[in-house]
Amino acid sequence: MARYLGPKAKLARREGTDLYLKSARRSISDKSKFESKPGQHGRTSGSRTSDFGLQLREKQKVKRMYGVLEKQFRRYFAEADRRKGNTGANLLLLLESRLDNVVYRMGFGSTRAEARQLVSHKAVTVNGQSVNIPSYLVKAGDVISVREKSKKQLRIIDALKLADSIGLPAWVSVDLTKMEGIFKKAPDRDEFGAEINESLIVELYSR
């Protein structure tokens, strides 16, 4: 299945929540009515979504938030299920550990899509080594840096200014001047994703 390239606001309205696909400077929440579904009049009021529909919708929402396609998402779920602990929490921690997501969390990209592009274009390094695989899993203690030749990119400079103004998550440490950050640890489940109900995804794949 190809990656979705259409209007981001339409996706957010479909899922009923901000998917963080646009910069916080122009948050979709400021432009869209999440309760209104795509279409001229939206979904007919009073219709009830089935349990399967709710589970499928939650999976689609998380896939779109992290920019992951179905086949890869299934692999993440299988790995999460193999690991000790809560499968749903394991799944989200794997997604949070993706290099493109960490680059986004560190503020080098204003959106995950922009961060993914930076990784693909070799604009960042991991522990001094060039890594251009967005799905690369970052480990605690890894150092993510913007390459010297990329430090003058206006989109990175603007993204860092934005990150500085709204703050960074506790599990990363970033030197804004050096454009370098440390992935201190995988985040605790209660530190992110309050809008995600991962148990619905576990239920879907357990059918």
Curated annotation (Swiss-Prot):
Native organism? Leptothrix cholodnii (strain ATCC 51168 / LMG 8142 / SP-6) (Leptothrix discophora (strain SP-6))
- Can you state the subunit structure given in the record? Part of the 30S ribosomal subunit. Contacts protein S5. The interaction surface between S4 and S5 is involved in control of translational fidelity.
Polar residues bias spans: 42-52
Quote the SUPFAM superfamilies the UniProt record gives. Alpha-L RNA-binding motif
Protein name, UniProt field: Small ribosomal subunit protein uS4
Gene name, per UniProt, is rpsD
The keyword Ribosomal protein is annotated on this UniProt entry: yes
Listed PROSITE patterns: RIBOSOMAL_S4, S4
Database matches in Pfam families: Ribosomal_S4 (PF00163), S4 (PF01479)
What the protein does comes down to: One of the primary rRNA binding proteins, it binds directly to 16S rRNA where it nucleates assembly of the body of the 30S subunit.
Compositional bias, Basic and acidic residues, is annotated for 27-38
Q: What residue spans carry the region label Disordered?
A: 22-54
